[in-house]
């Protein structure tokens, strides 16, 4: 059985079952999708056949059509997702532009907001990884991580921990950065704060001060 509360909620449903739609136009286009929960005006509005999605907040998962196993909480979170699956987004406009990217986690307002097709990214913090579009396998924890300075966009395999931590370029790969307001180069592990950092190349290279190991 289904539960529909609100004008035009579950309006197009045919054989879909075990759906809950609360709010005007929530799950409005759903036909055969099952086990979906939409709470908030326009939440999961375009969903047709997809299953096991949860959208809480105005227009959350608004454009989702066939993407499955997504969880979205916050106004316009995962708004443009269409076929991407197994994504988790909490916070206003988190993962807003995601369309087909899958297995991503964005927690915090505007976290991973520009991601479109990039998979397996984790961003926790206000505007964390906000400029990443197609990058993959990035992990970011902290306020504006990966978003200050140049802003990571298409790089992959980066780990950024600490407020304002980032990379030296938009396409940086395999940078490990720990500290506050410090940027790391690809292929290096960087620790510290601001300009006072130490850095070592991955592998057997010993730690060096920033003065002789700064990426140029």
Region spans (language model):
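Glycine- and small/polar-enriched repetitive beta-structure motifs of secreted/surface proteins
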Residues: 1-212
């Amino acid at each position: 059985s289904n539960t529909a509360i609100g004008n035009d909620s579950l309006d197009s449903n045919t054989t879909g079952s075990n759906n809950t739609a609360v709010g005007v136009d929530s799950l409005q286009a759903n036909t055969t999708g099952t086990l979906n929960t939409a709470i908030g005006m326009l939440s999961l509005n375009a969903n047709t056949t997809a299953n096991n999605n949860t959208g809480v907040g105005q227009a959350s998962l608004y454009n989702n059509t066939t993407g499955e196993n997504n969880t979205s909480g916050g106004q316009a979170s995962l708004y443009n997702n269409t076929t991407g699956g197994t994504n988790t987004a909490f916070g206003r406009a988190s993962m807003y532009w995601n369309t087909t990217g899958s297995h991503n986690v964005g927690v915090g307002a505007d976290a991973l907001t520009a991601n479109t097709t990039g998979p397996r990214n984790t961003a926790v913090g206000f505007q964390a990884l906000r400029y990443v579009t197609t990058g993959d396998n990035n992990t970011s924890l902290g306020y504006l991580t990966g978003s200050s300075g140049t802003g990571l966009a298409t790089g992959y395999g980066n780990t950024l921990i600490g407020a304002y931590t980032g990379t030296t370029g938009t396409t940086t790969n395999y940078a490990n950065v720990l500290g506050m307001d410090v940027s790391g180069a690809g292929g290096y592990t960087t620790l510290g704060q601001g300009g006072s950092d130490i850095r070592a190349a991955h592998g057997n290279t010993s730690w060096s001060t920033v003065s002789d190991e700064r990426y140029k």
